[in-house]
Amino acid sequence: MRTMKGFYVLFTLHLCFLDSGKTGKILVWPSDSSHWINLKVILDQLQRHGHEITILVPSPNHLFDLTKIPFNVENLQLPVTKETLKEELDTILYIASFEMPKLSWWDRRAKLREMGKRFFRVAKRICDSAITNKELLSRLQAAKFDICLADPLSFCGELLAELLNIPFIYSFRFSHGSVIERLCAQLPTPSSYVPGSTSGLTDSMTFVQRLENWLLYIMSDIMFLYFLFPEWDEYYSKILGKPTTLCEIMGKAEMWLIRTYWDFEFPYPYLPNFEFVGGLHCKPAKPLPKELEEFVQSSGKDGIVVFTLGSMIKNLTEEKSNIIASALAQIPQKVLWKYTGKKPDTLGPNTRLYEWIPQNDLLGHPKTRAFITHCGTNGIYEAIYHGIPML
């Protein structure tokens, strides 16, 4: 009898502390290209745990394949063609890849402003397609979402969350000069030992380098606060019907999911709502398609080199392509090169071109010896995960 009584007491206590699981509705305002690849990993897990995902996808776009998106999709029709969007993106990439490296420090600031204007022009069109669509807004309000997951480099997710009166979370890597982190998220960044993003500096700086870092912060602040953000401040104030700023709304983010990990960063202060999630997309390699596997095996003991410049860089000049191909032809390894464009005249017999490659599966192959990369976050962590040297 005493045993049964004890059981009931324990069972009652268990019920007191038992919390029933609850799934929610999540609205997603994503960015295109590699940002989407990383975000989708998070969304897949959320959906696997029973949460309902609705994603807003601009049309046309760069990388979204609607046939492979297993979530609810709301299409945002843009008043531009895919060709126009591609031309705008190619121009931005051309400036960054071929014009910027040749410019002086001061001239690069002017080019960055030009690139920012072009990028924000595209972002504004995407934002308009959602915010001015009253029918869409009504559907979203009726859906009663619990939270919005957005990318701060693709403005408007935070504005949409504000209109729907729901909290929002950011998935983020970095911004130029760490502007968004410093000014909007209020992240402490002493210029004496915290190198600004894209500065190329480390946390161990000489006096001159500290001065350079400080100037980067100042110039970035001026460029964004006085030349790029004001248009968005005015836009957000108009939509919300009250004076506000882009940074003020961004600062309301409940959490910032940083797509890197603390052991791969220089040490500097972080806030409690910054969470490192780098490498979430990493996974064991799957078997390669037959044609790829045969080419990889033909490399013998020398193995293979995987070469890719990511999902966006597709505008290498003919001259640069030939220089790279000529260099690759001189190494003993077989090379798998993710490449779009005219076949280089100097392409060696050891190199094959592919418009797409299973990057993670190749990096996890036992015959892979090195990874030539533009240092995109996804590729870096896949190479670390599989233990592959990077160039």
Region locations from a protein language model:
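Conserved, non-catalytic sequence blocks in retroelement Pol enzymes and Pol-derived host proteins
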Residues: 244
